[in-house]
Swiss-Prot record:
Cited Pfam families: Pantoate_ligase
Active site per UniProt: 37 (proton donor)
Lineage summary: Bacteria, Pseudomonadati, Pseudomonadota, Gammaproteobacteria, Pseudomonadales
Main localization of the protein described in the UniProt heading: cytoplasm
EC nos: 6.3.2.1
Name assigned to this protein: Pantothenate synthetase
Length: 287
């Protein structure tokens, strides 16, 4: 696996691979990699001949008071994990390489509606930062396909919409959430949790799973379901950001006759913000 730091080097390496007739896959990350990221790279390697990953902690998607400065930078360990997972090329640019004229004058990409609400409500500008950096990376790599984790469900919806609306010829693949044995979704931010907080954190998954099971059994009073779920999270020591049942494709509030649903949440354990979701496809409408 080679590591490059400039757009010119990146494009030259990708051009060589494409000139050899190889199908190109891309996995963008912010580093501090775990088994969930490795699963994305493995999926990419299964679908393509040449896998490009990026590591870039994107300042444009962090708001005031968020963890930009303390977000772990672990390049050497990340390189080893990417190599083991089947990555061929790592792009690890500086902020100056990505935003040479500065972020204040950077052209922005905004995906309305899908970026609003849920994480967008408590993190204004976040998805604009995500869409902007991902569109830049897509233009730099020009992959045939890109792989994203389903844990970031709203982000995946935003990226799919951006690719569709801007006519980008890129297949977007979602990879199921990788979890610890106790159900906690793997996240780079789990490392911020104290041992006591880590022991309590799986309650987020248990709550979502219980809500999903109730829906499968026919529960359609989503307001009551959310209220019960929130009480469980409160009892486990979480501080609320949001807990919702939404239509999985549009992210609008769920309606009783919807077949594709997502139970989705963000909550704070101490100062650490955790997100998770469970997707449901209902084959038959139940009473």
């Amino acid at each position: 696996m080679n590591t490059v730091k400039t757009v010119r080097e990146l494009r030259a390496a990708v051009a060589r691979a494409r000139g050899e007739g190889k199908r190109i896959a891309f996995v963008p990350t912010m580093g501090n990699l775990h088994s969930g990221h490795a699963a994305l790279v493995t999926k990419a390697a299964q679908r393509a001949d040449f896998v490009v990953a990026s590591i870039f902690v994107n300042p444009l998607q962090f708001g005031a008071g968020e963890d930009l400065d303390k977000y772990p930078r672990t390049l050497a360990a990340d390189q080893e994990k990417l190599l083991q997972a089947g990555c061929h090329l790592l792009f690890a640019p500086t902020v100056e390489e990505m935003y040479p004229d500065g972020m204040a004058v950077q052209t922005r990409v905004s995906v309305p509606q899908l970026s609003e609400g849920l994480c967008g409500a408590s993190r204004p500008g976040h998805f604009e930062g995500v869409a902007t950096v991902v569109s830049k990376l897509f233009n730099m790599v020009q992959p045939d396909l890109a792989v994203f984790g389903e844990k970031d469900f709203q982000q995946l919806a935003v990226i799919r919409a951006m690719v569709r609306d801007l006519n980008m010829p890129i297949q977007i693949i979602g990879e199921p959430t990788v979890r610890a044995e106790d159900g906690l979704a793997l996240s780079s931010r789990n490392g911020y949790l104290s041992p006591e907080q880590r022991a309590a954190a799986p309650a987020l998954y248990r709550t979502l799973n219980g809500m999903a099971e109730a829906i499968r059994r026919g529960q359609r009073d989503f307001s009551a379901l959310v209220a019960d779920g929130q009480a469980q999270l409160d009892a486990a020591g979480f501080r609320k950001d949001y807990l919702e049942v939404r239509h999985a494709l549009t992210l609008r509030p769920a309606q009783v006759d919807d077949r594709d649903l997502v139970v989705i949440a963000a909550a704070y354990m101490g100062s650490t913000r955790l997100i998770d979701n469970l997707y449901l496809h209902l084959e038959e409408q139940t009473a």
